[in-house]
């Protein structure tokens, strides 16, 4: 749609018509995690007391008791208008790849480490969440990536990613050879441990660890970050989000490779395969408490210095 991210600030609404905005709320969390289970239990009780219909993802529903309504993620996407993800960014990414196709609003409660995508505190979420449910929130749309593996002109595997798609060796780290094309224009051949193709959302994740730049979420851009390239002159490059990235794996690679989507989904790649990575038509509808500031998040999570005066 040509839009990577935008922010809207709806006016607040009264408690009497609060449920008109969100009526059915889904709860998703990290399975078998004590802190997550405690937060999910509190959320389920608190939301039910407020009169919302609450659906719990099947993987965590058993730990909340037999009387909860449970569905899998696909069913939740069809029935919920808001999903609350309890956990870290990894849990958010897993849910987002599914829920993005349904235009479900998603907000996170942080039970992980950094939590770039999870805004709400786990111990006192009630005040902030109450304001969100009454309409005091900001909406961001984050685009996803679509990765396809082509073999002899046919698609053998595909999936989507919120953060990044990564070409890399299978189980043993070693150097691989491949060519990189941008919109069918040859850019370079590469000998490296792999290639990261990241969205702005993913630029604070694996891409950042590999030396990539941080892209603000509203940028319509992708960043390509080589992993340990065998040349001193190779640097990350930022391209337009409308670009199609093609990685052609050299037939001389002796081992099977993989494309990982957000580190969760793995697509098998053989020597000679072509990987196409482009912006997906699906977008994650991420909501934040009112007053959300991206640079405040960066300062907090990355330990940047505060204002001097």
UniProtKB/Swiss-Prot annotation:
Protein name: NAD kinase
Source organism superkingdom: Bacteria
NCBIfam families: PRK01231.1, PRK03378.1
Active site: 89 (proton acceptor)
Listed EC numbers: 2.7.1.23
Function according to Swiss-Prot or TrEMBL: Involved in the regulation of the intracellular balance of NAD and NADP, and is a key enzyme in the biosynthesis of NADP. Catalyzes specifically the phosphorylation on 2'-hydroxyl of the adenosine moiety of NAD to yield NADP.
Family that this chain belongs to: Belongs to the NAD kinase family.
One GO CC annotation: cytoplasm
SUPFAM superfamilies linked to this entry: NAD kinase/diacylglycerol kinase-like
GO biological process: NAD metabolic process; NADP biosynthetic process
Principal cellular location given in the protein's record: cytoplasm
Entry keyword annotation includes Secreted: no
């Amino acid at each position: 749609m040509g839009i990577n991210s935008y922010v809207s600030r709806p006016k607040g609404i009264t408690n009497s018509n609060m449920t008109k905005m969100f009526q059915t709320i889904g709860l998703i969390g990290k399975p078998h995690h004590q802190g997550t289970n405690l937060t999910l239990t509190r959320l389920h009780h608190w939301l039910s007391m407020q009169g919302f219909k609450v659906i719990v993802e099947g993987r965590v529903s058993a730990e909340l008791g037999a009387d909860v309504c449970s569905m899998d993620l696909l069913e939740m996407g069809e029935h919920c208008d808001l999903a609350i993800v309890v956990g870290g960014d990894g849990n958010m990414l897993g849910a987002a790849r599914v829920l993005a196709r349904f235009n479900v609003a998603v907000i996170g409660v942080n039970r992980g480490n950094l939590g770039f995508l999870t805004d709400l505190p786990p111990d006192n979420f009630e005040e902030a969440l109450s304001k969100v449910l009454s309409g005091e929130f900001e909406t961001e749309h984050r685009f996803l990536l679509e990765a396809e593996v082509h073999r002899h002109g046919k698609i053998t595997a595909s999936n989507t990613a919120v953060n990044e798609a990564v070409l890399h060796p299978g189980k043993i780290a070693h150097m691989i050879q491949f060519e990189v094309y941008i919109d069918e224009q040859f850019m370079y051949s590469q000998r490296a441990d792999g290639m990261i193709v990241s969205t702005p959302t993913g630029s604070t994740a694996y891409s950042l660890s590999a030396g990539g730049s941080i892209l603000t979420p509203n940028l319509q851009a992708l960043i390509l970050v080589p992993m340990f390239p065998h040349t001193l002159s190779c640097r990350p490059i930022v391209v337009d989000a409308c670009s199609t990235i093609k990685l052609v794996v050299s037939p001389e690679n002796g081992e099977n490779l993989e494309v990982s989507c957000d580190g969760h989904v793995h697509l098998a790649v053989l020597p000679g395969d072509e990987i196409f990575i482009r912006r997906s038509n699906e977008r994650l509808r991420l909501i934040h408490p009112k007053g959300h500031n991206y640079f405040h998040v960066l300062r907090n999570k990355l330990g940047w210095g505060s204002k001097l005066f």
